[in-house]
Amino acid sequence: MHRLFILRHAKAATHPPTASGRDHDRPLAARGAAVLPRVARSIADQLEGHPLDLVLCSTSTRTRETVDLVAQAEPAVAAARLKLDDKLYLADPARLLKTLRKVHDDKATVLLCGHNPGLHQLALLLLGDDGSDNGSEHVLARLRYDLPTAGLVVVDLDGSWTSVGTGPGIRGAKLRAFVVPSDT
């Protein structure tokens, strides 16, 4: 079994615009940075003492800052191999799945940090209608509504990374947790 942590970047600054004027370069807002220690605790809880093997992160400033601040608060994230990938910037679910399918199966736990709407759509795709068999139907219903900034979705996946997201209804993907920082 593999565990996937899907983390949307924390709240980014909107004004003033960056010197470059590019969305890619927007940093985190102070309130976005402030919630990340709580997100780090949630990741630690869901790792259950196991190491985090790999962090896949968009190259945008806000995603890199999100991962950096989570790593400062959680040693397992700091110890994980970090791979920055410019193809994850505003990636759609197809691109995200392509990236996940390249992960080696010896990586049991992977954190993917990126952007909506792709991350939200990926989580919904993986979970389909059968993603909750552990009494978390209300949590899955809430996730269908939104993946907010700094939202964390933890999914357990059967099978290999190369087969993630294949087949109708994506059988074998189970929602383990959906954490919204304002709830912690």
Predicted feature residues:
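Domain-level recognition of soluble alpha/beta enzyme cores
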Residues: 130-174, 178-181
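Residue-level preference for the first positions of well-ordered beta-strands
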Residues: 4, 109-111, 152
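Short phosphate-binding loop-to-helix
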Residues: 87-105
